């Protein structure tokens, strides 16, 4: 993380000790976030973005399957009037294994970051960029033990 303060929460206690909160429930969040950064459930991702845009002062970033850019319903609901400032495509596949970390995992699924700028720097257009390969460069011996 490159922020001065990172606060995590979750909807259920998975043993990490995070404060519990249903992010999608109306009302005040547990804290005033500058950024909301999440990998939401695919079917609820638009809800997470809309809620994030309500509460964040800096921006919202969601990691979702790249096909999330498709769909007339999502376009009408979100992209038409609230397009992201950036769509950042991972050029290598990002394997995600439920409940654990497996450095040997592979996937056929492509992922992108969709990023909204709430702070006012955004000019209204959506920029597309590529995230270069980094998995091998960033991997460290011991990662599997730390995150398994």
Specify the residue positions occupied by each region the protein language model found.
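Class I S-adenosyl-L-methionine-dependent methyltransferase catalytic core
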Residues: 1-148
